[in-house]
């Protein structure tokens, strides 16, 4: 029979109209969703691309006069703007590059927010310049700025330990000429901790846009020994100051403000040439110029005869600044130097090797079971891992600790200007927050050889966040304006004979005699005197010689150059054993650093005002100097207090 095929059954069934419309609607909605997602992704990509390029570097300026002071924190001013219609909110990072081998130290970060089509805005970075090459070369100071989607190579800076500028009004007419470089007044830092390189400031107007922090920074810097030149403005008159700066309105032609000096010169700064500037600033130290070199700043020109006399037979002491931070950091690091039981460790190592082979081989021969061999191997590895960890840890004393040294100079507003160096040793690896209770804190590891896994935020809300592996060290330096008046001294009696101290007694408050080291000194003019405690007072003990004799720069420089930052110092292994020995060893270098003296010529130029004496007390570090982190365990250190004490009567010259 012939089988009939049902054609209707083979034909595709037609769905109802409502079902077809529902599928179309669902497909349409899915297409809309895909389109919406693609639009969002395109928008985000466009925004990301625009924000990545939403930052232009307009200008970059080093220091106060375009240069940097080696072995100090320096100002790096960066002018940025946003030329796009999108806002920019992100971080700009400054980091020191090591040629083509990556970066060193930890990155310094500044948060920046810029409106669309913003006007140029200045951003301040505070970075540490090592400059440890011969002659304080900064050829290795290759800094790079980076942000999301962009970067900028900062020009290599030139060196000037002592910088002199005239503040210019950026909103007014610039007056070119004269011996002093111009610095826009808006760039003056709001922290005294960033003014280490500044020596002289000429002012011809009141900086009305200054913040209270900038005004305080100028007065603190002046109190610590800065020099202000009051000169005529565009109206041919001296500027008149208001508020806290009104102390500069004194009519005295050459007056004192703490250890600083205010001079009034009835002329414009643009009319002061290099020869006149050298005469005005004759008593101030000059930037070092090597043999057969000409100074970039003619103010630093030295009498060739005097220069030859100083350099003859003493060229070594006229080289690089010996008191770089790694000198102090290396000594602090050695206070937690490992003292392992190497004999036991080597014996354990030999036993471990023997148990692996032929131990495991013999075990396999005896039991002929691979599971026994694997168990023996894993057990041996686990056992000796624990043993090596325990024995290795005991070389460090198994305690987290911080060792520090600091230089502290009291300020009249109940605070102290502090330069400090610290070494943190931890037994437990983690990321640690390093912060201090103060104003204008600046951090740096001063590392010249390796990258540091951490970030640094300097200034008002300073923080050093760093990863420290277990049983290892992390060194760092910092500057801070610390709350607290420190010790207070007062002259009770004084007697002078032929311009030198014959008798002196000082009352002391705010510090216990038992917390002070046996060595204390007093500086009058260029001469040091040793002091001793007796009946609750500090009394004159003996004449210790001038600054050159006491500071012993040759020996201190040998100490500095022989000190190896990586922990091994063959020159000091036998003579220096305890932390107390190392604290004592650092006293004279700290004393030189406090005077900003690194060369014989600078020591000869040390000269305090005739109406003050400076007392140096080397004492136990109080709690307010400590890192504000309870996880860092025991903290100990020494502070060199440098206290200026007014005399009842000015000594005869």
Residue ranges and their predicted role:
Residues 70-72, 131-200, 205, 260, ...:
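Aromatic-Pro/Gly-enriched surface loop or interdomain linker
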Residues 34-46:
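Bacterial N-terminal signal peptides
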Residues 371-394:
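Internal/C-terminal transmembrane anchor helices
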Residues 196-239, 259-265:
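Short alpha-beta junction capping motif
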Residues 197-198, 227, 243-358:
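A glycine-centered loop/beta-turn motif at secondary-structure junctions
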Residues 420-505, 509-653:
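Accessory, solvent-exposed terminal regions and/or long lumenal/extracellular loops of proteins
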């Amino acid at each position: 029979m012939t089988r009939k095929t049902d054609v209707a059954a083979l034909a595709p069934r037609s769905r109802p109209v409502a079902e077809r419309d529902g599928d179309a609607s669902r497909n349409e909605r899915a297409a809309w969703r895909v389109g919406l997602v693609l639009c969002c992704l395109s928008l985000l990509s466009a925004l990301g691309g625009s924000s990545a390029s939403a930052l232009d570097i307009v200008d970059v300026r080093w220091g106060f006069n375009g240069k940097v002071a080696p072995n100090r924190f320096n100002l790096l001013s960066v002018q940025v703007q946003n030329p796009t219609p999108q806002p920019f909110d992100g971080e700009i990072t400054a980091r020191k590059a090591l040629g083509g081998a990556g970066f060193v130290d930890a990155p310094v970060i500044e948060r920046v927010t810029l409106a669309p089509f913003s006007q140029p805005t200045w951003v301040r970075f505070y970075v540490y310049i090592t400059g440890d090459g011969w002659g304080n070369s900064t050829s290795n100071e290759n800094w790079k700025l980076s942000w999301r989607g962009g970067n900028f190579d900062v020009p290599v800076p030139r060196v000037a330990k002592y910088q002199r500028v005239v503040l210019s009004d950026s909103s007014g007419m610039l007056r070119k000429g004269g011996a002093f470089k111009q610095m826009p007044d808006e760039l003056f830092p709001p922290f005294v901790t960033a003014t280490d390189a500044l020596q002289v400031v000429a002012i011809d107007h009141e900086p009305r846009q200054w913040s209270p922090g900038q005004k305080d920074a100028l007065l603190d810097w002046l109190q610590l020994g800065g020099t202000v030149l009051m000169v005529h403005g565009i109206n041919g008159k001296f500027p008149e100051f208001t508020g806290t700066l009104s102390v500069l309105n004194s009519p005295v032609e050459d007056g004192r403000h703490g250890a600083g000096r205010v001079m009034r010169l009835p002329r414009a700064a643009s009319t002061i040439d290099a020869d006149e500037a050298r005469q005005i600033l004759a008593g101030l130290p000059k930037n070092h110029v090597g043999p057969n070199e000409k100074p970039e700043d003619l103010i630093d020109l030295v009498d060739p005869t005097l220069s030859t006399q100083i350099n003859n037979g003493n060229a070594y002491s006229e080289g690089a600044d010996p008191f770089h931070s790694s000198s102090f950091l290396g000594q602090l690091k050695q206070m937690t130097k490992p003292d392992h039981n190497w004999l036991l460790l080597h014996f354990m190592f030999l036993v471990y090797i023997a148990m692996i082979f032929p131990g495991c081989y013999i075990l396999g021969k005896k039991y002929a079971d691979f599971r026994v061999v694997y168990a023996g191997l894993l057990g041996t590895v686990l056992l000796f891992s624990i043993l090596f960890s325990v024995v290795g840890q005991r070389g460090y004393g198994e305690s987290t600790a911080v060792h520090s040294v600091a230089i502290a100079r009291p300020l009249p507003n109940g605070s102290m200007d502090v330069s400090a160096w610290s070494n943190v040793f931890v037994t437990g690896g983690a990321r640690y927050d390093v912060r201090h209770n103060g104003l204008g804190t600046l951090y740096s590891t001063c590392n010249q050889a390796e990258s540091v896994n951490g970030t640094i935020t300097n200034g008002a809300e300073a923080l050093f966040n760093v990863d420290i592996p277990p049983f290892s060290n992390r060194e760092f330096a910092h500057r801070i304006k610390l709350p607290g008046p420190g010790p207070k001294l007062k002259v009770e009696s004084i007697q002078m004979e032929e311009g030198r101290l014959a008798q002196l007694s000082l009352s002391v408050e705010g510090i216990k005699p038992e917390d002070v080291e046996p060595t204390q000194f007093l500086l009058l003019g260029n001469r040091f005197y040793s002091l001793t405690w007796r009946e609750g007072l500090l009394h004159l003990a003996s004449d210790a010689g001038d600054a050159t004799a006491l500071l012993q720069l040759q020996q201190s420089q040998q100490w500095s150059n022989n000190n190896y930052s990586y922990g091994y110092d063959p020159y000091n292994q036998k003579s220096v054993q305890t932390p107390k020995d190392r604290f004592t060893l650092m006293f004279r270098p700290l004393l030189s650093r406090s005077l900003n003296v690194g060369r014989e010529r600078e020591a000869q130029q040390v000269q305090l005002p005739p109406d003050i004496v400076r007392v140096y007390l080397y004492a136990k570090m109080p709690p307010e100097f400590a890192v504000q982190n309870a996880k860092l365990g025991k903290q100990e250190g020494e502070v060199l207090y440098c206290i200026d004490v007014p005399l009842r009567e000015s000594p005869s010259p």
